[in-house]
Amino acid sequence: HLTATNAQEAVNWYVKHFGGEATRFLRSTDTELPIDRVMYGDIAVIFFERDPGEGSVGSGVDHFGFSVGNVPELVADIVADGGTQLVDFVEFSGRQIGFVEDPWGTKIELINDPELRGMHHLHLSSPDPQATLQWYADNFGGESERWKDVLPGLNYGDIWLLVSQVQQAVAPTQGRSFDHLGWKFSDLTAAHRNLQANDVEFTMDPRDFRSIRIAFVEGPDGVRIELVEKD
């Protein structure tokens, strides 16, 4: 979940630059519901409509990434459309990378990785990356692998979770432009029980929300995480 002063404008901006499907809650056709999210396959980028506060940099979620074949051109388009280029282009493991910030303060990495196009990765910040990756593996699965044999991470098939080491403490994500992550469960009651057995801290126990059930936990480094059960 990201934040923006106008959810529809944010949805349009992301679709314009990164594609995806603009839609409503659960892809509803109810026109009384706002268009507040972009679907990239089964992955949703959802926007809260509020002041974005501080940006993602400096929090436990530094940025997320998209894989595209035209990194320089897309960076230029983004800068012309209210975004900001953060650093010069770099080469990493033979791939060109650019970093931008969207108009609401969330950092985005653009990488040319032909093996996985579209939504590509979540990149967290932590003083202890190995412990953070292990926590996510223990509680949310994923295959422990090195991306391109270089960066340790968790592979979820349609997205990677990567963690970089930082020396300073990181800020909690809640209230910033990248407010929280989310994971889907088929049985939230069982997930609640299993996560509690792993000493995961629940900041909101499971409850009904519209036609789904949700809960919130706090991950390492102040990362807020939503748990969702859908029919």
Task: Give the role of each language-model region.
Residues 2, 23-26, 66, 75-124, ...:
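Vicinal oxygen chelate
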Residues 5-49:
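N-terminal, post-signal-peptide region of Sec/Tat-exported proteins
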Residues 6-22, 77-81, 128-144:
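Amphipathic alpha-helical segments
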Residues 6-7, 68-72, 128-129, 185-189:
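Helix N-cap motif at beta-to-alpha junctions
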Residues 48-51, 109-111, 166:
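Amphipathic N-proximal alpha-helical interface segments
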Residues 53-56, 64, 69:
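Post-signal peptide N-terminal segment of secreted/secretory-pathway proteins
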Residues 60-63, 177-180:
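Eukaryotic phosphotyrosine signaling hubs
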